[in-house]
Regions:
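Rossmann-like NAD(P)(H) cofactor-binding subdomain of soluble oxidoreductases
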Residues: 52-136
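NAD(P)-dependent Rossmann-like dehydrogenase/reductase catalytic/cofactor-binding core
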Residues: 217-305
Length: 305
């Protein structure tokens, strides 16, 4: 199976590395020092008990050099999504599928503005990883999973699932109700990203104080309320279960958005707390905590030069 990774940052590179190790022919679209390092020395995954070193990977710095592929795994930050989609458009074959693994609930509709909607498949991903150094991805471990739209038996998605059965340290599943799963991730991620970014804190510090813990839980509750008002069915114990999962997470756990703020990069804020705020306004659901996050961080949303 021929796969391109569009957006080979920490998450994209991790997924691509595991798929290549399972036998896929993978092309990584990666820019800058990270992409150059991959071209020269391959790609390394550092993970407790599950290290992986691929001495040779095919890395290109622009999709214009992309050969025909069966699947594009679209893992670009939402801040760069439209530009990346436009750059992909000229080389996209009619039989190629584009699997978006981006955050938020809007990626399929966003990409549909630039790419044929019939070729786009929704999905979501659960991976904890950072770029430790150019060409080196570090993960603390844990459960890493891709969930993709089954798309009524689409053979490309079936091939991805079959490939996933051979993957180590990456579970690949297909779902008929992927929209629900995307919403469930959005509920938790919007709260977690908003809280860790606004407070400039890791989850262990947040949960060590009752007031910051209450703020995090309020964010989750608001996300649930908005989802329900939007017509989504949310598990009855979702708030309690999500808070329980965060208490079991490594104390150093924090969101990529908090890291982006620290580095002066553009933030996915408009598609996370900003989206909860917008939905709350349109649906008549109060979202004071998410509104506070959005308004407090909006000046940093485009990054700092």
């Amino acid at each position: 199976m021929k796969i391109a990774i569009m957006g080979s940052g920490a998450v994209g590179a991790y997924v691509g590395a595991r798929l290549q190790a399972a036998g896929a022919d993978v092309t990584f679209v990666a820019r800058g020092a990270h992409g150059q390092a991959m071209q020269k020395q391959g790609l390394q995954i550092i993970m407790p008990g599950l290290d992986l070193h691929l001495p040779q990977v095919h890395a290109i710095d622009h999709p214009s050099a992309l050969e025909p592929v069966d699947l594009v795994v679209f893992a670009v930050k939402l801040t760069d999504a439209m530009a990346a989609a436009e750059s992909l458009k000229p080389v996209l074959r009619p039989d190629t599928r584009v699997l978006t693994l981006q955050n938020g609930i809007d990626s399929v509709s966003m990409l549909s503005e630039a790419l044929p909607q019939a070729q786009i498949r929704g999905g979501t991903i659960y991976v904890s990883a950072v770029i430790e150094a150019p060409g080196v991805i570090k993960s603390p471990g844990g459960f890493h999973r891709v969930v993709a739209d089954a798309a009524k038996g689409d053979p490309v998605m079936q091939a991805l699932a079959a490939l996933g059965e051979r993957c180590e340290a990456l579970d690949v599943a297909l779902a008929d109700d992927v929209a629900r799963i995307i919403w469930e991730k959005f509920i938790g991620l919007s709260a977690f990203s908003g809280c860790t970014t606004l407070l400039r804190a890791r989850i262990g510090d947040i949960l060590s104080h009752p007031e910051s813990t209450a703020f995090l839980q309020q964010l989750v509750e608001e996300s649930v309320a908005v989802a329900q008002a939007a017509g989504q069915t949310v598990p009855a114990q979702m708030v309690d279960n999500y808070m329980k999962n965060l208490r079991a997470a490594p104390p150093s756990f924090r969101s990529s958005m908090s890291e982006d703020l620290e580095r002066g990069k553009a933030l996915e804020l408009p598609w996370l707390s900003g989206r909860v705020h917008q939905l709350g306004q349109s649906l008549g659901v109060p979202t004071p905590a998410h509104t506070a996050v959005y308004r407090a961080l909006v000046l940093y949303a485009k990054g700092q030069a």
